[in-house]
Amino acid sequence: MSLQPFFGFPPTVNDLFSDFVSYSPRLNNQIPGELSPSIDVHEGKDTVSVDVELPGVKKEDVQVHYDSGKLTISGEVVNERKNESTEGNQRWSERRFGSFSRTITIPAKIDADRIEANFSNGLLTVTLPKVEKSQTKKQIAIK
């Protein structure tokens, strides 16, 4: 029996391991089937604040709903150019389009009647005032 030199894995295997090792939540929109906006949740003395990155999304394409301690942000990223002709041009697109929904468990009792949502420059900020006794359901209008 003789030993043969090992020259490494084929490129596809190396790419598979590189992608796996470098995966992070910031890259979640590059995984097929996943469209999930990035969020930050801040809990202060009187409020819980949720910031949601929604670049390229219109306010009217987003819904915010609060139900029994869970905040759901849902909507759709619409491809405005999908009907444009690409004849004669090479087309490259790394942006994702389609529906999304993200549900967050809020770590405090919330006054559902005072929840506010503001949308500006692709950032949705939902402010949830804390209260000792919480309500269970509320649809929130975005300003």
From Swiss-Prot:
UniProt keyword Nucleus present: yes
Entry keyword Cytoplasm: yes
Database matches in InterPro entries: A-crystallin/Hsp20_dom, HSP20-like_chaperone, Small_HSP
One Pfam family per UniProt: HSP20
Miscellaneous comment: Regulated by the spc1 MAPK signaling pathway.
Assigned protein family: Belongs to the small heat shock protein (HSP20) family.
Induction: By heat shock, and under conditions of deoxyribonucleotide depletion and DNA damage.
Annotated signal peptide: none
Domain sHSP residue range list: 30-143
Keyword field: Cytoplasm, Nucleus, Stress response
Originating organism: Schizosaccharomyces pombe (strain 972 / ATCC 24843)
Name used for this protein in its record: Heat shock protein 16
GO terms under biological process: cellular response to heat; cellular response to misfolded protein; cellular response to unfolded protein; protein complex oligomerization; protein folding; response to heat; response to hydrogen peroxide; response to salt stress
Highest taxon of source: Eukaryota
Compartments, record wording: Cytoplasm; Nucleus
SUPFAM superfamilies: HSP20-like chaperones
Single GO MF descriptor: unfolded protein binding
A single cellular component GO annotation: nucleus
